[in-house]
A protein has these predicted regions:
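Short, conserved "active-site rim" segments that organize catalytic pockets and cofactor/ligand binding
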Residues: 1-58
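Basic/polar, cationic surfaces and motifs that engage anionic cell-wall
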Residues: 1-12, 46-50, 67-69, 76-139
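Extended aliphatic helical segments
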Residues: 22, 30-31, 73-76, 100
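Intrinsically disordered, low-complexity segments enriched in small/polar residues
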Residues: 27, 38-40, 73, 108, ...
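Short, well-ordered helical secondary-structure segments
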Residues: 31, 60, 102-104
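Short, surface-exposed glycine/acidic/tryptophan-bearing loops
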Residues: 57-74
């Protein structure tokens, strides 16, 4: 079993309201990026449904230098529909509720893990909101 010390949250960096599926992300990661598998463990759709992308026993490909000991949660969205991919918190109410659900579950499985946004490790806006609004779940 992998030692998990971080939960790292991401956005798909797609315009507000545009749905992306696990298959879409997998195609981008595997076909376009030539990765061995999809990078995220979980993807939260616009309707708040949580989709398993990658077994937690397998390291993701989502945050250079931190993949080995982390779980990746990603939500669909994160950019304004302005044609410029401007970072924006586009979470739907359903996605916000889904974050509470999945982060609560992950904290129960990995009580020593800390919560982070991708932007804490890379020069990015991802996940386009302050993930630490959910820190109360990790107390």
């Amino acid at each position: 079993m992998r030692e998990i010390n971080r939960i790292i949250c991401h956005c798909t960096a797609t315009p507000e309201g545009r749905q992306q599926t696990v298959a879409d992300i997998k195609r981008m990661h595997v076909v376009d990026n030539h990765w061995s598998h999809i990078g995220y463990h979980y993807l939260i759709y616009l309707d708040g449904s949580i989709h398993n992308c990658l077994d937690e026993s397998i390291p993701g490909i989502h945050c250079s230098g931190y993949n080995k000991h982390s779980i990746a949660v990603c939500y669909v969205g994160g950019c304004a529909a302005d044609g410029k991919l401007t970072a924006k918190d586009t979470r739907t109410p359903e996605q916000k509720a889904a974050f509470v659900k999945i982060l609560t579950q992950l904290h129960k499985r990995y009580p020593a893990a800390t919560l982070h946004g991708h932007r804490e490790f890379a020069a990015k806006d991802c996940p386009s909101f302050d993930i630490h609004e959910y820190d109360y779940l990790f107390k």
